[in-house]
């Protein structure tokens, strides 16, 4: 077993040859490299598969032996200072390594087909391979310096991949926004690392924790300064994991290709902040203030992300805000001290959200066959609907991922989210109420996405809904599905289904848009997609190829069964012996013994069923509300009396509409947080820059320039005096002598 750990340092560097070879090939043999570009997917997947096998083997060794291995190379600079580099293999490392490699392989396999038409195919695989190298280096780092180096490399890869289509201004702005926002957190992280080194004199985790605990126990350090360093360290995690208030970059990061959203912004990179807090958990756990701060930031992010997802029309941005909210659950769990629950939810959410992002990529891929390449259209749920019969496999996979994220048993996220909700009641009833309410919101907005995408009719073909000859309006619903059936004008339900063009959009029923007659009668062009020199012509969305469906089906299996590794109860065998089937707790045993007073994680059946019933009921209630509001209206017209009674509530209805509009505006405007940052920070910095520019030009440059100009004019004036006549020289001599005497007399009188 020792030799396995000894050679584990190679894990981050196995995939590094791929970007190097692609770069060398494009530099030396550009034509041949581009001609054989599809072959580069194989070495990317193959090398990452080797790392995956190695990581799984290490995880099995961790489960069987609970052994922590650390190997260090020391570089001595002088007698007082040396840099140490190495790798650390512990349960946290093995979990993240398996997660990165499994999701990474599936995403690369998926990307081979998804990006096959793109001119940047080679660049994409080079970036992705370099990202996996950076991420694996991050999780295997044995000290803070290595973590910071790979932390920055991960940020660079994210910048490159978000701005992959850099010719699009919106993508270019998005990658800059992500880069700058993360630099704020990274600067705090760097200051925290330096402050921690100043306190302990070490960057190595094991030495650092021991020294830090001794200093705190013996009261030999300024606790306020220690708390400040901890807050600075946590700021790096806030930015990287898109926690409030540095969350603003994540929705814009969806401008990159969809596969990177599945790998980077769902499963791995955004989880780096969770990993950092988990890695430094022995340090944070002895500082009550920082633990409370982590929990507070987590619960704010949980609720904020859920509310901002309510009104999104872009399917990827809806999933992005969902990711933000779920990362808040993980941060909340860490702040409460539920180390195991946080990592459990990290695992289950990664696979479920990767499935949802790949499913959204399949949806977008099918929509592009109709609408062409235009993210504003192909990602817009307004133009979707009725996709069940066109992409049934994608629909099934997306539904399973949605049910998992909603917290429906027995899917993966149910087990982890239920554990966090249960622990939140022990920590704070207020936090627990917010967390449970947000769990219902999660089920609501996720099923909203599902219904808007797959339910009802396909909305992209307006001519398919020409309706009756007297109908001149076609209504596209942003919040629900509206039928095309003609209703009696006397029905009061009509007020709920149609609105005047001049009216603003409400929460559930959106504006109707008048369609020009020429547009209604025009023939929509078919989109020809070339792939492997074959042509396919589509007039409706089509199912993706097998190379895109296969990774989704594998992720479906993970979504169904990965929750089994953390089932929090034990069973007895036929001989009456207690069987420990909680693999996750067994894997985390070394950490749990250090961080928890009571490592016993088993619960009885009654408690488990009671808690599970409560959390599942919340999820089902959210799904019911979403189904009630977003199912097609034409299927609900059988009970007009119910709808009419709902519509007759005059003042209450008006108040309800106002509340709904406030929520809609809050959600669609991103909680006004981006606008606040634009006005306060961006506008303030620009005003400050203008002031500095004015000071530089007018004061700094103006002073020497003014002296020079003044000297020039004085010299020109004196030049005219020098005419060569002695009488003028004597006159000026007497004049200057008189001025000197006056000054001397004034000073003398002042002194006397």
Curated annotation (Swiss-Prot):
Domain of life the protein comes from: Eukaryota
BP GO terms, sorted: ATP synthesis coupled electron transport
Reactions it catalyzes: a plastoquinone + NADH + (n+1) H(+)(in) = a plastoquinol + NAD(+) + n H(+)(out); a plastoquinone + NADPH + (n+1) H(+)(in) = a plastoquinol + NADP(+) + n H(+)(out)
Annotated localization: Plastid, Chloroplast thylakoid membrane
Single GO cellular component term: chloroplast thylakoid membrane
Keywords annotated in UniProt: Chloroplast, Membrane, NAD, NADP, Plastid, Plastoquinone, Quinone, Thylakoid, Translocase, Transmembrane, Transmembrane helix, Transport
Record GO terms (molecular function): NADH dehydrogenase (ubiquinone) activity; quinone binding
EC number: 7.1.1.-
Membrane spanning residue stretches: 9-29, 40-60, 89-109, 125-145, 147-167, 185-205, 219-239, 258-278, 280-300, 327-347, 354-374, 396-416, 425-445, 549-569, 608-628, 728-748
Membrane topology: Multi-pass membrane protein
NCBIfam families: NDH_I_L, PRK06590.1
Function of the molecule: NDH shuttles electrons from NAD(P)H:plastoquinone, via FMN and iron-sulfur (Fe-S) centers, to quinones in the photosynthetic chain and possibly in a chloroplast respiratory chain. The immediate electron acceptor for the enzyme in this species is believed to be plastoquinone. Couples the redox reaction to proton translocation, and thus conserves the redox energy in a proton gradient.
Name under which the protein is recorded: NAD(P)H-quinone oxidoreductase subunit 5, chloroplastic
Protein's gene: ndhF
């Amino acid at each position: 077993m020792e030799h396995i750990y000894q050679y584990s340092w190679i894990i981050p560097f196995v995939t590094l040859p791929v970007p190097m070879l692609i770069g060398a090939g494009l530099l030396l043999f550009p034509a041949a490299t581009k001609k054989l570009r599809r072959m580069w997917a194989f070495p990317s997947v193959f090398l990452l598969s080797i790392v995956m096998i190695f990581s799984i083997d290490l995880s099995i060794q961790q489960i069987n032996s609970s052994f922590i291995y650390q190997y260090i190379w020391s570089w001595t600079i002088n007698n007082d200072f040396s840099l140490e580099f190495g790798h650390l293999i512990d349960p946290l490392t093995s979990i993240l390594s398996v997660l990165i490699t499994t999701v990474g392989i599936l995403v690369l396999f998926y990307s081979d087909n998804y990006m096959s038409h793109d001119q940047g195919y080679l660049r994409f695989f080079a970036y992705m391979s370099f990202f996996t190298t950076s991420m694996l280096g991050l999780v295997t780092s044995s000290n803070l310096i290595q973590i910071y180096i790979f932390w920055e490399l991960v940020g660079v890869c994210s910048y490159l991949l978000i701005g992959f289509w850099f010719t699009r201004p919106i993508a270019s702005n998005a990658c800059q926004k992500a880069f700058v926002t993360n630099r704020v957190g990274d600067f705090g992280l760097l200051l925290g690392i330096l402050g921690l080194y100043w306190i302990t004199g070490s960057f190595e985790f094991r030495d650092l924790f021991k020294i830090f605990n001794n200093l705190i126990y013996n009261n030999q350090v300024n606790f306020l300064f220690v708390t400040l360093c901890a807050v600075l360290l946590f700021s790096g995690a806030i930015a990287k994991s898109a926690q409030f208030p540095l969350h603003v970059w994540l929705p814009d990061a969806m401008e990159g290709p969809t596969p990177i959203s599945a790998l980077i912004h769902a499963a791995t990179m955004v989880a780096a902040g969770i990993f950092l807090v988990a890695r430094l958990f022995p340090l944070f756990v002895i500082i009550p203030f920082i633990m409370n701060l982590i929990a507070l930031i987590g619960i704010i992010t949980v609720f904020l992300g859920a509310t901002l997802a309510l009104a999104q029309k872009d399917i990827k941005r809806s999933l992005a805000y969902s990711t933000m909210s779920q990362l808040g659950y993980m941060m909340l769990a860490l702040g409460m001290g539920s180390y195991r629950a946080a990592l459990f939810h990290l695992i289950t959410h990664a696979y479920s959200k990767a499935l949802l992002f790949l499913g959204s990529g399949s949806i977008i891929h099918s929509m592009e066959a109709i609408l062409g390449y235009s993210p504003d259209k192909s990602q817009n749920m307004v133009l979707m609907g009725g996709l069940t019969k066109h992409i049934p496999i994608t629909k099934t996979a997306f539904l399973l991922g949605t049910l998992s994220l909603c917290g429906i048993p027995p899917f993966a996220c149910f087990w982890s989210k239920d554990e966090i909700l249960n622990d939140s009641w022990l920590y704070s009833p207020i936090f627990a109420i917010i967390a449970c309410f947000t769990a219902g919101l999660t089920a609501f907005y996720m099923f909203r996405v599902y219904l808007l995408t797959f339910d009802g009719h396909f909305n992209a073909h307006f001519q398919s809904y020409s309706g009756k000859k007297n109908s001149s309006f076609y209504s596209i619903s942003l919040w629900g599905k509206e039928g095309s059936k003609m209703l009696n004008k006397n029905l009061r339900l009509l007020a709920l289904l149609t609105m005047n063009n001049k009216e603003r959009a409400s929460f559930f029923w959106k504006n109707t848009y008048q369609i020009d007659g020429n547009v209604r009668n025009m023939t929509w062009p078919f989109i020809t997609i070339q792939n492997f020199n074959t042509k396919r012509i589509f007039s409706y969305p089509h199912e993706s190829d097998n190379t895109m469906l296969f990774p989704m089906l594998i992720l479906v299996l993970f979504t169904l069964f990965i929750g089994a590794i953390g089932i929090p109860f034990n069973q007895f065998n036929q001989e009456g012996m207690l069987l420990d089937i909680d693999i996750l707790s067994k894997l985390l045993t070394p950490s749990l013994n250090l961080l928890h007073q009571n490592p016993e994680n088993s619960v009885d059946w009654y408690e488990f069923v009671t808690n599970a019933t409560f959390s599942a009921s919340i999820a089902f209630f959210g799904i019911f509300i979403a189904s009630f509001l977003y199912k097609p209206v034409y299927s609900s017209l059988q009970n007009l009396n119910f709808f009419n009674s709902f519509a007759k509530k005059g003042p209450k209805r008006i108040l309800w509409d106002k509340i709904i509009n406030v929520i809609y505006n809050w959600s669609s405007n991103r909680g006004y947080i981006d606008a606040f940052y634009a006005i306060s920070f961006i506008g303030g910095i620009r005003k400050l820059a203008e002031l500095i520019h004015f000071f530089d030009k007018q004061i700094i440059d103006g002073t020497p320039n003014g002296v020079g100009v003044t000297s020039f004019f004085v010299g020109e004036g004196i030049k005219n005096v020098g005419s060569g006549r002695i009488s003028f020289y004597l006159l000026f001599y007497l004049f200057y002598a008189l001025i000197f005497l006056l000054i001397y007399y004034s000073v003398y009188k002042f002194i006397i």
